[in-house]
């Protein structure tokens, strides 16, 4: 079971590396990593389990955040219409996105960042992603609103980008310039 002790914190170089694609079909090890990450996110949202194990609540977790430099992440979050997105994804790729941007009015947080970082994080309002789910099935999803923001936050982790790198005008010792390929 993944706990907060397994979460890599900001300042660790693995969070700044571009993660490696995983081999397909998924190995049993990669499938298990996705299942374990998804279990952590679900547990973090259960008040009893979270209190018992000292888990901070989250809606997504990327493999680099547990020290694994692979293109894997898990999400367990509900969109504005009540649709649940609960899955692990391997080799996610954005195949299209809007020019229009969106942000969470209260900013973003991160399980790897143990402090509040004020500021708006501009994200694409809509995007289409492809990848392979934790059961090995090809997926293609059109996302918008809150759930699109969650996916982009996790995708950034796979590219070595922290959410605060996107906050304009932020003076922060951990902030890095965005790479040229950033969405």
Swiss-Prot record:
It is an enzyme of class 3 (hydrolase). It catalyses: N-terminal N-formyl-L-methionyl-[peptide] + H2O = N-terminal L-methionyl-[peptide] + formate. Keywords: Hydrolase, Iron, Metal-binding, Protein biosynthesis. Pfam families: Pep_deformylase. One of its GO terms (biological process) is co-translational protein modification. Its cofactor is Fe(2+). The active site is at residue 154. Signal peptide: none annotated. It comes from the Bacteria. Binds 1 Fe(2+) ion. InterPro entries: Peptide_deformylase, Peptide_deformylase_sf. GO terms for molecular function: metal ion binding; peptide deformylase activity. Fe cation binds at residues 110, 153, 157. SUPFAM superfamilies: Peptide deformylase. Its EC number is 3.5.1.88. Removes the formyl group from the N-terminal Met of newly synthesized proteins. Requires at least a dipeptide for an efficient rate of reaction. N-terminal L-methionine is a prerequisite for activity but the enzyme has broad specificity at other positions. NCBIfam families: pept_deformyl (TIGR00079). PANTHER family: PEPTIDE DEFORMYLASE (PTHR10458), PEPTIDE DEFORMYLASE 2 (PTHR10458:SF8). HAMAP family: Pep_deformylase. Belongs to the polypeptide deformylase family. This is Peptide deformylase. It comes from Shouchella clausii (strain KSM-K16).
């Amino acid at each position: 079971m993944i706990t907060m002790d397994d979460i890599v914190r900001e300042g660790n170089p693995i969070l700044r590396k571009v993660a490696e694609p995983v081999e397909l079909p998924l190995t049993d090890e990669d499938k298990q990593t996705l299942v374990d990450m998804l279990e952590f996110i679900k547990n973090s949202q259960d008040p009893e389990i979270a209190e018992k194990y000292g888990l901070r609540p989250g809606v997504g977790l990327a493999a680099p955040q547990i020290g694994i430099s692979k293109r894997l992440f898990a999400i367990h979050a509900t969109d504005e219409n009540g649709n649940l997105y609960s899955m692990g994804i391997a080799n996610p790729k954005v195949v299209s996105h809007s020019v229009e941007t969106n942000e969470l009015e209260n900013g973003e947080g991160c399980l790897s960042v143990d402090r509040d970082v004020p500021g708006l994080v501009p994200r694409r309002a809509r995007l289409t992603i492809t990848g392979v789910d934790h059961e090995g099935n090809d997926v293609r999803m059109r996302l918008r609103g809150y759930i699109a923001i969650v996916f982009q936050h996790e995708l950034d982790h796979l590219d070595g980008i922290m959410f605060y790198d996107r906050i304009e005008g932020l003076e922060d010792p951990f902030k890095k310039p965005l790479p040229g390929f950033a969405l």
